[in-house]
Amino acid sequence: MKVLAIKLVDYREWTERLGYDREWLIQKIQNKFMMKIHEIASQYSTFPLQLRFDNFLMIVDGITNTQLIYMINDMQENLPVGIKTCLGYGKTPLEAQWNASVCLNNKEDKFKEYVDEKIAALHFDINFNTEALKYTSVYDSFLEITNIYVDLSRFLYKIGGILQYLGGDNYLGFVSTNSVNKVIEKFSDDNKIKVGIGIGQNARTAIKLATTSLEKIRNNREKTWHIEEEYH
């Protein structure tokens, strides 16, 4: 699988130049440029996992190196600092992002040609969480969401996957297609979490299919997982 690692260069120095009354401004600018990056990424059929904001990842199977270069140039035009990128390859998203991350510390960031793989996206949703908000505090609900995020992250890490919190009670994960059965086995009898699985040629399609799967689960309350796959 192919993962693009993106690092904002001299990001800390940029934030420090904003003065002491800066946290609100940092959040404003971060959200503004991430909104633009999401828009650009969607045009190239990928999706940014924003993670730390100053470092983020993209699953880029199904995208040519030429398209990646155009996308990176488009992103650079909308960021307040320079960026460094590196393309990593691995049997799993976890391995690919590790190789891409190591590459970020090297002087050269040339893109090698790698084989594209199908992408498996996972859209997790917590059952009854919205209803539970009536009986707990906003902060306690957030703590529960955070604990589940940690548990899901650890599980996916063990099978070579990566995870991003989407907001609310939703999470987005990526695994290799070889690990999908492990996900199904884990959540087939789980009455707390449902997972929509999508398999596609690129990240955007895989995520769309994962969300489609999740909606089908919601319409059939007896199921805890469903899978949709793109065929060519």
Curated annotation (Swiss-Prot):
Gene3D superfamilies (UniProt xref): 3.30.70.270, Nucleotide cyclase
Record GO biological process: biosynthetic process
EC number(s) given by UniProt: 3.5.4.29
Keyword Coiled coil on entry: no
Keywords, ordered alphabetically: GTP-binding, Hydrolase, Nucleotide-binding
Catalytic activity: GTP + 3 H2O = 2-amino-5-formylamino-6-(5-phospho-D-ribosylamino)pyrimidin-4(3H)-one + 2 phosphate + 2 H(+)
GO function term, MF aspect, one: GTP cyclohydrolase IIa activity
Signal sequence segment: none
Family, similarity comment: Belongs to the archaeal-type GTP cyclohydrolase family.
PANTHER family for the chain: GTP CYCLOHYDROLASE III
Function: Catalyzes the formation of 2-amino-5-formylamino-6-ribofuranosylamino-4(3H)-pyrimidinone ribonucleotide monophosphate and inorganic phosphate from GTP. Also has an independent pyrophosphate phosphohydrolase activity.
Official protein name in the record: GTP cyclohydrolase III
Source organism: Saccharolobus islandicus (strain L.S.2.15 / Lassen #1)
